[in-house]
Amino acid sequence: NGGWTTREQLNDMEFEAYEELVRWMATLPLYAVVETEERPYLLVHAGIQTEAARAFLLEHGVDCADGAGAVGADRELLQQMLAVQSSDDLLWIRHGYWDAPTGLLSAEGKGPVVVSGHTPTVSLGRYCEVGGLAGLDEESGRGQIVRLGGEDTAGVPDRIDIDCAAATGSEFGRVGILRLDDGAEFYANINPGE
């Protein structure tokens, strides 16, 4: 995953600014559960270990099997489920997350949807079947938000990748913003030199 650019930039910082940045980063959450009128969303950097998530929920009385999903899980239980996820998975997972449904949505499309990034949508084809260049907007040729799953959940995707390759720079990259209340997408291109 590199990190060399970040490392170089951190090395170039004044020590006090570096310390302040590290202190601030330590206060940031690894995950969040937010609710809209329609459903809860699990916000994580990279994804979740779905088998561990379903096992935790089952231990706490929510059986996701047979198309039931995690409909019975309230916000507090979803927070607890995320709290026991490995921080490595929350920050780095790809295989085992993008390539299979989460099992958290019911057959009717009810339950929590996972929103994550870390994997640029232009690279999703390495980790799952997304069909062609789903991660590239045909008109602009830049990264775009991709919704995955839905085949067994009444057309409702169970995973949303919002990493539109901003870190790759101006050729493909842009910032993607997803408004959860209505699913509206907004984009800001990365310009040369940014």
Task: Give the role of each language-model region.
Residues 39, 110-112, 157:
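Conserved catalytic motifs of the protein kinase core domain
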